[in-house]
Amino acid sequence: MPFSRLFGKKEKNQMDDIVEEGVQRVLELPMDKIFPNQFQPRTVFDQDKIDELARTIRIHGVIQPIVVREMEPDYYEIIAGERRFRAVLSLELEKIPAIIQNLDDEEVAAIALIENLQREELTPIEEAKAYRSLLDMQDVTQEALAQRVGKSQSAIANKLRLLKLPEAVQQAVLNKQISERHARSLLALETEATQVDLLAEIEENHWNVKQTEARIQEILGVKKPTTTKKTKPKRQAISRDVRIAMNTIKQSVTMVKDNGMDLDFKEEETDDFYQITIQIPKKK
């Protein structure tokens, strides 16, 4: 089966056609002979949903078989249906119905990615790693991959940029401690150490994206020259205070003169200071 066929599928029933193509029968395979998909993009499974599925299986059994491929004699890798496998495992059942398919690594990786994308269950980091895996496997561009999985090229590129973040930040996204927008905003910071430090601030203060972006602007602003901005208000404040002092003195002199006191008032200005001389005669 050509690898490109996998990327052209949009609907879930079409994906089912792929994994069931050439199916002869459903087998009951031992649970201890089955292991998870090495290309499974999902690393975080919702245990509540697994438990809910297990309760359904306990009552109705496994309605839809899992799909596997034989890796070694009597050892099988899951292609599709890992949640069903985990649910059956939690029930401690010995066997699970399965369909065996002969698919290569690239086809298995593509099916795992597309299945999860259709269900919209991947975290942004899981999705990014799946895209990276497929790009590494196939000599295709981001644009070609985007067309095949029904995404825009910019969406693929934005997801891949998340993989440039430190492991601690990626893990926080996986665990849903911060959002994808939080994570993308951290890319504006130059060093991993600064990114990790800000991650701690976000978690400690429960900042939303807007607050996080404001903090990033503060951090970036520290590196910019601010001497002129700091001294200008200071000079304005000093100039304003001097004018107030000068006006107060002049008003006082005027009041004294209005009361009949004869005095001389002289004002001189230098580069460094104002000089005021007031002469009051001892005798009238």
UniProtKB/Swiss-Prot annotation:
InterPro entries membership: Chromosome_partition/occlusion, HTH_ParB/Spo0J, Nucleoid_occlusion_protein, ParB/RepB/Spo0J, ParB/Sulfiredoxin_dom, ParB/Sulfiredoxin_sf
DNA-binding region: 143-162
Stored Pfam families: HTH_ParB, ParBc
Keywords, ordered alphabetically: Cell cycle, Cell division, Cytoplasm, DNA-binding, Septation
Function of the molecule: Effects nucleoid occlusion by binding relatively nonspecifically to DNA and preventing the assembly of the division machinery in the vicinity of the nucleoid, especially under conditions that disturb the cell cycle. It helps to coordinate cell division and chromosome segregation by preventing the formation of the Z ring through the nucleoid, which would cause chromosome breakage.
Family the entry assigns: Belongs to the ParB family.
Name used for this protein in its record: Nucleoid occlusion protein
Organism of origin: Listeria welshimeri serovar 6b (strain ATCC 35897 / DSM 20650 / CCUG 15529 / CIP 8149 / NCTC 11857 / SLCC 5334 / V8)
Gene expressing this chain: noc
